[in-house]
Amino acid sequence: MGFLTILKKKQPDPAINDYFVKVSNAAQRIASMIQFTSEYEKIGVNAPVWQDCSTVVDTAVKQTPLEKVVVKNDLTHGTEVFADPLIVKVFYNLMDNAIRYGGKITTIRFSVEESGEDHIIVCEDDGVGVVAEEKVKIFTRGFGKNTGMGLFLTVEILSITGITIKETGEPGKGARFEIVVPNGAWRTTKKDT
């Protein structure tokens, strides 16, 4: 990408600008795919471990360029999931997608619900949401406006320990991702007060 920056500064002919933009976009896509490949090959390398959900979300927040978006982490300390150590990437991807595609998003909220013996970690935002026709497709490799790899990677990371994810939001009212953690893959530990 360094040579493209130099070329842009020295570019004498504005007529060539369209070609420059296409080459620059292609280079960015290639760089993103290389990064994805690097991350994908790490899935399952390390054994799953118990991880505090609230702490993992806090770590992901620090890695995410939030701009003016507020993240509300309502997950309580002491609720743990048994997952691949890359689970932090799951929460990063959800926030990154909300910021990229949510429109005029102001808030992302993480919470937990119970459904029978399962725990559901909810990530919801106040953006534009996901249209009904794309609720399943967004998890497919290559689908999307950027690299199409983030939510595919999310599914792969979660599936290591039988955790699933689905989008259940209402289009026009925000996205809502439900991470379904089956019985045996979550636990509550004693909290310090």
Where is each model-derived feature located?
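Conserved catalytic submotifs in the C-terminal HATPase_c
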Residues: V70-V81
